[in-house]
Structure formats: structure tokens, C-alpha cells
């Protein structure tokens, strides 16, 4: 049984190592709209490149579904890019409106999680239903406590810990997204890969957990009451992006492992 994390072949890893720091710098300084867009999309291409290269020799349902999930994620990254108008007012203290593009990004990422769910189930030697149910419920309870699911108007130690203010029209979409991402994480934790000789049994869980954690940073940035970009330090930006892009790379590494 392998205990090491397997990363995808090809130059994607080196591309991500090069572009991710540049994305963090561009985001932190907020001086280059082109830089943010360019380095974010290149970082997305990095985690997708490995599975795409393997697609010609690996035609398994697992490979196709993971690749589809990564493609949906790249599409989500594109939709979440700020418009030039949003970029020019990103340091404003005015309340920010959630754009149609952002909503499309949420839908794209939901599709990515659904693809991962089917991928994990398609390549599982066993599934623990008890662990599946427990993980799903625990994740939804955590989402409610953090304020992702129908948050109250005020933050407290027992509810809405992230101090989120989600508009009424966005609450149903965010709730459905929370259901889907909780399902993805629960399936990742409760399934065992068919091939344990080449991939760690915990690699799916690790990648899924990193993806889930990165979404909390997105939620805080999009819906937090005190989440203006100029109030985010470089460390917070680096952790959020690092969890997301390297989490996707970890998931991509399970293809052909």
C-alpha cells in the first residue's frame, strides 16, 4: 500500500510552482488586472495538463470524470475572474454585488464536485455508508456554524462564525452548493480506491479537504462583511490559493496512479 501523495506527470507541477506565487503577488498588490487573470488561468491549466496528457492512454471512467471535474473547475476559475469594473473598485468600502458571472462560477464548481463524486464512486473497492453519512452530516453542521448555510444577521461563537452576509437571492444557490461539496467530501472520505499499490488511500480525502477549505476563503471574500481585498494580507491570499490549486493537483494526481 502506497502512503506517498502522487502528483500528475508532465510540466504542470513546475508551471504551478512558477505561476502561483506570481498570482499571489498580483492579487495582494492589486495593481495588475492582466496579471491576476493571466496567472490564475495558467495555474488552472497547470492542474489540468497532467490528466489531459494521460487521456490518450487512459480511457477509464475515473480518468474521464476527474478530467471533466478539472475542466469544470477551470471554467469556474474563468467565471470568477473580476471584470475590469470590479477590479477598479475592489478596494471600495461600498457593498459589492454578486455578479451573474460569479453565480455561473458557483454552478461550474458544483458541476466539478458532482464529477468528482461519480469518479470516486466509479473507482471504489468498498464504500462505508456509515462514514459517508457521518461525514456528510458533520460537514453540513460545520457549514451552518461557519455561516455558509442560511446565516443569521449577526455573528456569534455559536453561529455564523465567519460573519457572512449572503443576499437572499444567493442563499438557495449557496445552500445547494454546500450540499454538493459536502457530498463530494463525504464520498472521498468513505470510498477506498481500487488500486492501493500505487496511490495512497487518503489522497482523495486530502485533495477533497483542501478543496473544501479553499472554498471557505472564497466564501469569506465574497460574502464577508469585512472582506475588502485591501484588508487581506498576502498570507491569507497565499493560503487560500495554495489550498485550492494544490488540492486540485492532488486530485489530478489520482488519475493513472
PLM segments and residue spans:
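Polytopic alpha-helical membrane-helix bundles and their juxtamembrane interface segments
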Residues: 1-257
